Swiss-Prot record:
Presence of keyword Transferase: no
Protein name: Small ribosomal subunit protein uS5
Any one GO BP annotation for this protein: translation
Family membership noted in the UniProt record: Belongs to the universal ribosomal protein uS5 family.
GO cellular component: cytosolic small ribosomal subunit
Description of its domains: The N-terminal domain interacts with the head of the 30S subunit; the C-terminal domain interacts with the body and contacts protein S4. The interaction surface between S4 and S5 is involved in control of translational fidelity.
Length: 218
């Protein structure tokens, strides 16, 4: 099976297409075997049964149109007994723009390897997002925004997502916009606290807020 996936790479938020060959994939987990054998046919079944995704190929099969965006690449230094070692750190977000999103971080000595690791982690971190029309100024009942006010936090960064009426758009910073767009959110107001210049914490705060829409008990 060959799956085409849109991948965003340098410059940030630009797009290219890669071809993923899944015919050579040998599942290592029971869930992976169930997916490859066709016993599980949708990503919804995985979360409905509280399964844990441990292989990114599961996501590649069940969400073949998954889009990916490179949010940031930094050169970081790590002190070892042999001296300082340089590595690249990449932050990647993935989503199908229809209710699923994930964020991951990867480190490696080469940029491409760091991006690949971050993409793999983002797929493993994929979560469903509950969408709706939660603004009292809008009554369209379409899943264009968040259904209620929800918050997310990572490090010093905290973000609040506020339902907005249709047509408002994404009132947020570039990093937040990318994650929200991949999740399928089209209209939302945001409030932030902390150092939003830290891309990883900012992206993870948005991710955690979106994750909370699904796990929040109404």
């Amino acid at each position: 099976m060959r799956v085409k996936a849109k991948i965003f790479i340098r410059p940030l938020f630009a797009t290219y297409v890669s071809v993923i060959d899944l015919s050579l994939w040998e599942p290592r987990t029971e869930l992976g075997r169930m997916v490859k054998e066709g016993k599980i046919r949708t990503i919804d079944e995985i979360f409905a049964n509280n399964y844990i995704i441990k292989e990114p190929e599961i996501v590649d099969i069940l969400l073949p149109g998954l889009k990916q965006e490179l949010l940031n690449v930094n050169l970081v230094q790590r002190q070892t007994h042999a001296g300082e070692r340089n590595q690249f750190q990449a932050v990647v977000a993935v989503g199908n723009e229809d209710g699923y999103v994930g964020v991951g971080i990867g480190k490696a000595r080469q940029v491409r390897q760091a991006i690949e690791k971050a993409t793999r982690e983002a797929k493993l971190n994929l979560v469903p997002v509950r969408r709706g029309c939660g603004s009292w100024k809008c009554s369209c009942d379409e899943p264009h925004s968040v259904p209620f006010v929800v918050r997310g936090k990572s490090g010093s960064v905290e973000i609040t997502l506020i339902p907005a009426p249709k047509g408002v758009g994404l009132v947020a910073g570039d990093v937040a916009k990318a994650v929200l767009r991949l999740a399928g959110i089209k209209d939302v107001w945001t409030k932030t606290r902390g150092d939003t210049r830290t891309t990883l914490n900012f992206a993870m705060a948005v991710y955690n807020a979106l994750r909370n829409t699904y796990y929040f008990k109404i």
